[in-house]
Amino acid sequence: MRPTLLAFLLALGPAAVSAQAAVESAAPTAAHAEVLATIDSFLAGLRTRDTMLMARHVDTLARLTLLRPGPAGSRVMLLSAAQFMRAVSRPDQPALDEPIRNPVVHVDGDLASVWAEYQVRIEGKVSHCGFDAFHLARLGGQWKILNVSDTFRRTGCGDPWP
């Protein structure tokens, strides 16, 4: 039995080293900063209703996957980025401010994901909060948002963040 255990541990060795390398590569890099800058600029466009700025940071096929409460539990709403930008830039709708905090960024080559808390504020008051999950790809040397998924709740959001 001992030779079998030794063989198993030896076989596991490269996988353990590979997993350790993957964890170490999760340390912040220039790509992490670029990904966050892309998201921050997109959210600045949201805050100022600047559809040109928002569009600069999304792929033409980008989607928003929104989980919203419904009578039988969460329901999924899908919007194209174009539909979303039209909706949030309408002059008859209040401007939205959606800061994020505590982002967790993962980058592997040309693919990135970011998980972060968010608050949506309307006229300085917290409307709702939850978590955003962004997926981005580096296309033509630029990070582009492919998808934003979020959760939604109206309670437990706290005061507006600084």
What are these language model-derived features?
Residues 64, 73, 122-124, 138, ...:
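A short local loop/turn or secondary-structure capping micro-motif enriched for an aromatic residue
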Residues 1-4, 20:
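Positively charged n-region of N-terminal signal peptides that target proteins for export
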Residues 63, 67, 75-125:
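Surface-exposed, charged secondary-structure patches
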Residues 39-50, 58-62, 66, 88, ...:
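Sec/Tat-exported extracytoplasmic proteins
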Residues 4-15:
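Bacterial N-terminal signal peptides
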Residues 49, 59, 100, 109-111, ...:
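Extracytoplasmic
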Residues 17-52, 56, 60, 78-79, ...:
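Short, low-complexity N-terminal intrinsically disordered segments enriched in polar/charged residues
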Residues 113, 128-156:
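Short beta-strand edge/turn micro-motifs at domain boundaries
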